[in-house]
């Protein structure tokens, strides 16, 4: 984890707490899912000035917190939630999806022609972007599909219109004094790390119900795709 953190922060800067919208603006766009920040960077470079917006999906959400990536004005927001909801969320999507690393649910026929893969991800019939990283076919598909005709407001699992990301160890430690004082004063009495990968089985709402019931004097930290069960909830703030 230390090596991954070092590589990401030295390349893209230290993550900053960031609000991320779930609204998709009208016009051509591309959805990028997976974990590979380098692929996202290359796509942002190749789409700059082409009138195409980029939206993260799933574990690509933290990209919005990195200063180097945030500088791209067409990195607009996040679309959808976790991996197990791909078939529902991508159904008839008027945009292509780039899968970088990890989870790919078998595409439905309604969007199979919009699936593009790269690196270790592949699927029969899907266009695979090789190591040259020429995203021209993906860009052309986005322009062909055209996106939504009007802005579309989406929400998280619990109806929230935005999510937050970027509360990494550096961000927390930069406010260590404030946190310690809040603990001493009793403003913060609990820390909960709600972490883990999610699954597709219906009724898996333990994470959501747990977080909803955490007391107001608690801090909730999260890891992995289980966060989409509750990261759109407004839990308020402690001391700003």
Give the ranges of each region predicted by the language model.
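Metallocofactor- and cofactor-centric catalytic cores in central/energy metabolism, strongly enriched
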Residues: 1-240
């Amino acid at each position: 984890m230390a090596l991954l953190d070092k590589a990401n922060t030295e390349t893209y800067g230290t993550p900053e707490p960031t609000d991320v919208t779930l609204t998709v603006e009208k016009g051509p766009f591309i959805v990028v899912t997976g974990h590979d920040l380098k692929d996202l960077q290359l796509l942002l470079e190749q789409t700059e000035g082409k009138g195409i917006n980029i939206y993260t999906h799933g574990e690509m959400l933290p990209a919005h917190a990195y200063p180097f990536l945030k500088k791209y004005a067409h990195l607009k927001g996040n679309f959808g939630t976790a991996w197990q909801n791909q078939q529902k969320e991508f159904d008839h999507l008027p945009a292509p999806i780039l899968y970088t690393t990890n989870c790919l649910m078998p595409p439905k026929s309604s969007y199979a022609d919009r699936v593009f893969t790269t690196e270790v991800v592949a699927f029969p019939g899907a266009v695979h972007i090789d190591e040259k990283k020429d995203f021209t076919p993906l860009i052309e598909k986005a322009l062909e599909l055209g996106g939504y005709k009007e802005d579309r407001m989406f929400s998280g699992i619990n109806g929230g219109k935005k999510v937050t990301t970027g509360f990494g160890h550096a961000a927390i430690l930069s406010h260590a004094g404030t946190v310690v004082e809040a603990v001493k004063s009793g403003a913060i009495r609990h820390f909960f790390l709600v972490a883990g990968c999610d699954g597709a089985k219906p009724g898996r709402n333990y994470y959501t119900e747990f977080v909803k019931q955490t007391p107001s004097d608690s801090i909730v930290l999260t890891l992995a795709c289980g966060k989409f069960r509750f990261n759109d909830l407004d839990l308020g703030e402690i001391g700003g």
